[in-house]
């Protein structure tokens, strides 16, 4: 890469030796994984000795070192999938398997203008920011300020500081979106909320023709109501619905079999595209429905009426505090990385001058 090419946000703290303030994933010989934050003079203790952080600081990624009792540990930076499952959370996160599908199905491209509603703990926001890059825009909407605080801390931890492409608005999407985004100015909309059908009008106004709406929803009743709402709206293509199931495999010589556990249903994804103004939706021909349903039937089994478990304020405050502390450590690690990178570039620039002499 040319020295004149700007480094993308978050890239510099994914390279080089381990630095103070970084999150590091250590794995013992039995495959047990622990994520620690490196600190000068810090120690990781277990019932079988302790590991000094100073032995890792300055070491290359992928180092294997013993603790005081000779137990070996493998040290690596957490991948995205590891980070989002271990980061502080106030709300449930979008699992990596679903985040990957959202990026692909919604065709999130570099420079895209994306609206996201339902930030939660920021797991999906991180994936979206990585996809749009520094010159795109992810405009996130969240109703609860305390959830936004957790997401902000996690995003800054992942990228080593604020991301230039991230904007955050507090409030209901259907009320706030028309005030902050021009009609037809948004490329993609990602909804993770209990009642996405309530936002269809605001979303249709904001989306550019050909833009993509993708919704992450938990139950079949939500999916049914959303799909019927899209069809009645008339400004979207026929919705596509699916779920993603991931099954690992155990491989040891010729002993090859599926794992005993798998990541099965987490949510459904519903995808549709915005039609041009005035276009008539192509409705697929299908057999007449054998049974009708009422509004009462549709509302009976949505999470808000079944009794969705609420996250306590105490847990949210603790998650926000932890996320803020981790973000501060990550910012320090990023500063060290920038200093090291600047020194390396200066040394590289000085080499041609020395050889010329």
Describe each region flagged by the PLM.
Residues 121-134:
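Conserved SAM-binding loop of SAM-dependent methyltransferases across substrates and taxa
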Residues 109-120:
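Conserved class I S-adenosyl-L-methionine
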Residues 2-67, 84, 228-357:
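SAM/dcSAM-binding transferase cores
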Residues 129, 197-209, 231:
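A short glycine-rich, Lys/Arg-flanked "PGG" loop and its adjoining helix->strand segment in the class I
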Residues 135-139:
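Short beta-strand element of Class I
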Residues 13-16, 86-99:
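Conserved SAM-binding loop and adjacent beta-strand
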Residues 141-191, 196:
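S-adenosyl-L-methionine
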């Amino acid at each position: 890469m040319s020295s004149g090419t700007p480094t993308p946000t978050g890239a510099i703290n994914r390279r080089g030796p381990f630095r103070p303030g970084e999150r590091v994933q250590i794995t013992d010989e039995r495959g047990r994984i622990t994520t620690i934050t490196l600190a000068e003079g810090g120690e990781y203790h277990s019932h079988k000795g302790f590991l000094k952080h100073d032995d890792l600081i300055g070491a290359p990624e992928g180092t294997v070192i013993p603790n005081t009792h000779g137990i070996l540990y493998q040290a690596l930076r957490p991948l995205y999938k590891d980070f989002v499952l271990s980061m502080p959370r106030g709300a449930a996160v979008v699992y990596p398997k679903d985040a990957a599908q959202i990026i692909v199905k919604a065709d999130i491209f570099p420079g895209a203008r994306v609206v996201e509603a339902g930030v939660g703990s920021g797991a999906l926001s991180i994936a979206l920011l990585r996809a749009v890059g520094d010159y795109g825009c992810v405009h996130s909407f969240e109703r609860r300020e305390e959830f936004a605080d957790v997401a902000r801390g996690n995003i800054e931890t992942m990228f080593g500081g604020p991301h230039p492409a991230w904007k955050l608005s507090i409030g209901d999407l259907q009320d706030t979106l028309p005030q902050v985004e021009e009609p037809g100015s948004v490329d993609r909309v990602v909804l993770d909320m209990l009642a996405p059908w309530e936002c269809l009008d605001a979303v249709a106004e904001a989306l550019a023709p050909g833009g993509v709406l993708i919704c992450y929803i938990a139950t079949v009743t939500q999916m049914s109501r959303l799909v019927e709402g899209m069809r009645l709206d008339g400004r979207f293509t026929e919705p596509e619905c699916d779920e993603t199931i991931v099954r690992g495999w155990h491989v040891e010589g010729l002993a090859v079999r599926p794992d005993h556990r798998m990541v099965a249903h987490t949510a459904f994804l519903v995808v549709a595209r915005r039609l041009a103004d005035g276009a008539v939706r192509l409705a697929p021909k299908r057999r007449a429905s054998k049974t009708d349903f009422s509004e009462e039937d549709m509302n009976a089994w949505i999470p808000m009426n079944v009794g969705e478990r609420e996250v306590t304020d105490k847990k949210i405050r603790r998650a926000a505090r932890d996320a803020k502390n981790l973000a501060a450590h990550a910012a320090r690690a990023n500063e060290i990385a920038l200093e090291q990178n600047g020194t390396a570039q200066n040394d590289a620039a000085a080499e041609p001058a020395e050889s010329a002499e």
